[in-house]
């Protein structure tokens, strides 16, 4: 009898792709991420017993665990095929423990790319779980839990409820805050430039030459008077070409993508957030349905700091380049890239799994975002294996009365890799365009047409963008490939940092929290300290350090800082100043301030109580518009009927004046940071109370949840959309008195009537007609009973109120624990 094998991966998409490559003897199932973790309700780390973590099955996954146990029991071998990194290794380790697998039965396999060849080879060469890799993840998890659960409550008490601190996120906020302080402290310095428009009389072509200096020394004019002196000193002296230099300049292609550089370039070129970039990259890695090919993993593993490319991939790129572009576009020798200092180099760089699957060829099978990101990865990889671009560079030295001017031009002579790809720049400034020069010769005279003196001022350092913050984190050793995107998302979600256009700046809240952290917990926000912690985690992964040694070394100083902070801040509460906006009050003209209320942040006049004007504040939400891929924005309005505020979510292009960009997507459902594992679109959750599990709203997806199954209270057909919005977002807010009374009357008796109907249903087989009739009778009975028995109605009302109060008390006690759990990954 043939042996039966079970393969466990994280997601259904990955399971589908791998299942296609394995035979009928293999059953592939998804764990849907972690199945066991530290509990949410408490610290989950036994500090008294040497920091022993207390793991437990994740609530809500009991059925899945039972299903996997059953499948594992009936299988001869269980292949744990989670992602090839620390987190993936830990998931496999937890699975092995949960499913009670011994070393003989449990086999660990990893796939750097999900192709038939790699999957087949990996299954043939399984290995044991790498305990060093698991321990590195445990150390990181326990460190983050200790910092998050013990430091966050202090922020709640001393600053504001709902705050959190983290080992990496707090450093990232400080980096943004420090940059803002640099900008505020910057003092601009005046300087001038002088250009001369010169004409070659032979060709009658005019070009621009830039002032360099005098008598071979560089001069940088500091004032307009100095420029005037230079012009006066030159007077009517002639301009003569004294030196011509012609060279071929070669430019090498960019390195292949790592996680960090992919996130940076996707931010610059595609306007994708780091989180969105990783979500789309995950889809491309796990597999996409391609016409004629089936489900195909399109790229290699996307969490990597390696620049290494396999020899097989280099050979495939060479064949493709020679076939499409010709011999001149391939370098004399194949390009191999060295690993950067500190890189773990466990995987290859990010590249297409099959370079022959061009973006244009599979465009019809991909979503817009998948296509753009795949094209970026494919182009960058191919360019990294191509010949240099060659530029014809000409520079001229021009003298006039001892004063020196320079003119230069650079023209593309051979496109090389630029035929496929060119890297974007971080800043907004455009590269200086060098115009063409006429055919100049040494000794020839030139005619002066005019001078162009220009005043300039030195500029402060630019604020960070998503891309430059990630680059700075990588350069300073803050975090690892798996933490860059979650960290940027976390500091934005916590409102420690906000986006001003594409630039990041600290909020007053971020400044206050960072100030507190710098004063009381200097190690937590110190870049060098955090970088050393990352290095220690790397030594755990390498098997050189025991993971609990890392925790012990850290905890002594942290516990001392925590105790000192509690004493020093006893009885104190730090005030967060209002953030002044550029919006003017429509009533009195003052600059409005940003405040937080029950419906979130809003703009208010600082002249309260004499001026009570307020207006909504548009806030960017996680996720993308399912219609056009634009950003989702949180907007508010006020009901004309009830004069109450309601919230809805719309595409950023809903107010666009450009008809080509305008998008009419809007919803009452709240967009989440999660993507549907089936179709890849942003998932949403119900506004207000109850049913908080994210769901897919894509009708074409098998995971689609219809509107009537999302937990909303069904409204009367005559109710306006505006009223529906109000109740959807503020289901827990007070409705009008009349509505409250009616709702209570109906609810009080509906419960009893429903039970009666239920009993009747058990004994009698009902048809659709009988069901409808029963519902009609129930409503009528409830209404009559509510009208006839006001005493019972009042009792029901009191009971409901008592329960609600008790629930609120319970919630308040556990709220801090829940929020503290949300530390960075």
What is each model feature region?
Residues 1-138, 150, 212-213, 221-224, ...:
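Intrinsically disordered, low-complexity regulatory segments
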Residues 2-6, 17, 152, 185, ...:
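Basic, low-complexity terminal or inter-domain segments flanking catalytic cores
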Residues 17-21, 67, 90-98, 118-122, ...:
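Alpha-helical scaffold elements adjacent to nucleotide-binding pockets in ATP/GTP-utilizing enzyme cores
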Residues 118-195, 247:
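C-terminal or mid-to-C-terminal helical accessory/interaction module adjacent to the motor/catalytic core
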Residues 140-151, 168, 198-200, 249-261, ...:
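Core structural elements
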Residues 158-162, 177-223, 269:
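C-terminal helical "lid" subdomain and adjoining coupling/linker elements of P-loop NTPases
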Residues 218-255, 444:
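Metal- or metallocofactor-binding catalytic centers and their adjacent structured scaffolds
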Residues 261-273, 470-480:
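Short helix-coil junctions and helix-kink-helix linkers
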